[in-house]
């Protein structure tokens, strides 16, 4: 699967431990396409939850996108989209620019950049 930053995908997050988001769910590709497709066999994603609880590291997906919910920045994770267990598939859309900007700003804040 070729994934570009901003792509909305669905992927199985199992196995997990502790408070990590689990099960099959939508996710947002946050790593750059060059990283995903040239430099690494891994892709960095953030899971999307349907629960909106006001968590400071959850970015609400704007209306009109292919998915509803919140992008969980604190659950940033590198996964292998080619692993058959993950069952990754494109949802046929990308996240809108404004929401993607908020996501990238939040990730930058997590890492102090």
PLM regions and their residue ranges:
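Conserved functional hotspots at enzyme active or ligand-binding sites that engage polyanionic ligands
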Residues: 1-113
């Amino acid at each position: 699967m070729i994934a570009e930053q901003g792509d909305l995908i669905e992927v199985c997050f199992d196995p997990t431990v502790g408070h990590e988001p689990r099960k099959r769910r939508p996710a947002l590709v946050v790593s750059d396409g060059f990283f995903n497709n040239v430099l690494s066999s891994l892709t960095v994603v953030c899971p999307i939850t349907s629960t909106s609880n006001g968590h400071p590291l959850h970015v609400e997906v704007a209306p009109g996108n292919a998915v509803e919910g919140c992008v969980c920045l604190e659950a940033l994770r590198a996964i292998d989209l080619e692993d058959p267990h993950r069952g990754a598939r494109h949802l046929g859309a990308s996240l809108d620019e404004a929401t993607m900007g908020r996501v990238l700003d939040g990730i930058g804040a997590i890492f102090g950049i």
